[in-house]
Regions:
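Glycine- and small hydrophobic-enriched segments that form the cores of compact globular domains
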Residues: 1-19
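C-terminal cap/substrate-recognition subdomain and adjoining C-terminal extension
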Residues: 11, 19-162
Length: 162
């Protein structure tokens, strides 16, 4: 991800997550310890009460992404997430609603162990999401490094007008 930061030195990194604010310090620790570029965290409020007006994680991510598009109308975005929740659908929606604003989409494919989590069975499985069809190039891989191996050459070519 630092290579993306090097390619686009004036572009900010936004970390948009469905995680609640009470885990902010853990996420910041992860970002720092793994050498990710600095950037603001956009997390969601946690409300333990059932059926409240606080948006779901998926709705939170879509609303924040749309707000970023509105706040930075001249900025283009690279969207990176995973297939464990609704990132593919959310990112395809953003790409369709804001044509020409999304340069690329990266989706990390979760491993079977990540999908089953601590449950260790299909009963505890989090359904992975396929990537909907979009006009934006989509790069997939099981790690961020895998995604970058194919995404970076594309971004370089796009940056050079090739």
């Amino acid at each position: 991800f630092n290579r993306i930061a090097d390619m686009f030195p004036d572009a900010p990194f936004f970390y948009l997550s469905t995680s609640p604010w009470n885990v902010e310090s853990s996420i910041r620790h992860f970002i720092t310890n793994h050498g990710f570029p600095e950037g603001p965290l956009l997390l969601r409020d946690l409300d333990p009460r059932p059926k409240t007006f606080i948006p779901s994680g998926v709705q939170h991510k879509l609303e924040y992404a749309e707000q970023l598009m509105a706040d930075f109308p001249d900025m283009k975005f690279i969207l990176i997430g995973d297939d464990g929740q609704k990132d593919p659908t959310t990112y395809a929606t953003i790409a369709r609603r804001y044509p020409g604003r999304v340069l690329a989409i990266g989706i990390r494919q979760l491993s079977p162990r990540e999908v089953t989590g601590n449950f260790g069975s299909v009963a505890g499985r989090v359904a992975t999401q396929p990537m909907p069809v979009t006009d934006v190039p989509v790069f997939t891989g099981t790690t961020g490094s895998n995604i970058m191996k194919t995404m970076l050459p594309y971004l370089r070519a796009a940056q050079n007008g090739d």
